[in-house]
Amino acid sequence: NFFMQSFVNRKVNVEAHVENRQLSDLVLNGGYRIARKQINKINAIAARFRYFVPFGDIFEEAEETKKLVSLHAQFGEGWLLPAEIVAFAREGVNNVVSLQPFGCIANHIVAKGIEKRVRNFYPDINFLSLDFDSGVSEVNIVNRMLLFMDNLKK
């Protein structure tokens, strides 16, 4: 979805007059249709596997995410991180650990910033955001994971 996010970002930016239409909508819509067709093929092939969850439509995921965070939050993974959490919650996955490598400050800000809003919309969610960088101690990670597991909601 990281690649597919760019189609939504462009639409949002053009509508907000943040970005000019350098490419015609016809070209971009065609690119989206081609990418979506390939995703549908992957979904069809992988559907044979018991635990496979099909890739959703990025525009539908963006619509759901607008309740939590502005789609103008495009730094790092931006609104995609909350979109994935919302998708998990809608599928009934209520225990989510978000691992952020190398101190990605943009993802750290979004993950911490949306935590309360996610819980307001999805009260059954058990959410933990862990940053992995050189300054994080193993004890801190283990303690936070143990606390997370103590709060697992069945």
Where are these regions (language model features)?
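An N-terminal assembly and electron-transfer interface module characteristic of large anaerobic redox
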Residues: N1-K154
